[in-house]
Regions:
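Long, contiguous N-terminal structural blocks used for assembly/anchoring
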Residues: 1-57
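Short amphipathic alpha-helical segments that mediate assembly, nucleic-acid/protein binding
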Residues: 6, 86-87, 107
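Generic detection of short hydrophobic beta-strand segments and adjacent strand-loop junctions
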Residues: 60-62
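Long, low-complexity intrinsically disordered regions enriched in Ser/Thr/Pro/Gly
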Residues: 64-82
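Long acidic/polar interaction regions in large eukaryotic complex-forming proteins
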Residues: 89-91
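Acidic, proline/glycine-rich low-complexity IDRs
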Residues: 96, 101-121
Length: 122
């Protein structure tokens, strides 16, 4: 068993292309250099449209710890509209980091779950 490192969670969730989707309004990372190398305890303030008028968007601060907690939650109970592929990738983060391979879609699902509390866009 090898759990994902902070660098790996950053790479899989922030670097997989999900933030290119139009509903991601703002991304403010800290603890990461210009090359994407984690330099300490990283965080990312993310703002996502909600799909509703009020409020039109939500903001949350994501970190390695938040991602790992969300991965465990998804493993325990698959959120509505979440793919089984995303659930499997969450299991890899927790138990077999070398096998983790998030793409834009699966990382977007987990990011929406963490920021919005549900998966709205897909």
């Amino acid at each position: 068993m090898r759990t994902a490192t902070p660098q790996e969670t950053f790479d899989h969730l922030m670097g997989a292309g999900a933030l290119q989707y139009g509903w991601w309004v703002e991304y403010k990372p800290t603890g990461v250099d210009a090359d994407g190398t984690v330099t300490g305890d990283w965080t990312a303030e993310l703002t996502c449209e909600t799909g509703d008028d009020d409020p039109a968007s939500k903001t949350a601060v994501i970190s390695h710890q938040v991602i790992m907690a969300a991965a465990r939650s998804v493993m325990a109970e698959l959120p509505q509209y979440a793919s089984e592929t995303m659930q499997g990738e969450c299991a890899h983060l927790v138990f077999d980091a070398d096998a983790a391979d998030f793409d834009a879609g699966t990382s977007d699902e987990l990011l929406q779950f963490m920021v919005l509390g549900e998966i709205v866009f897909g």
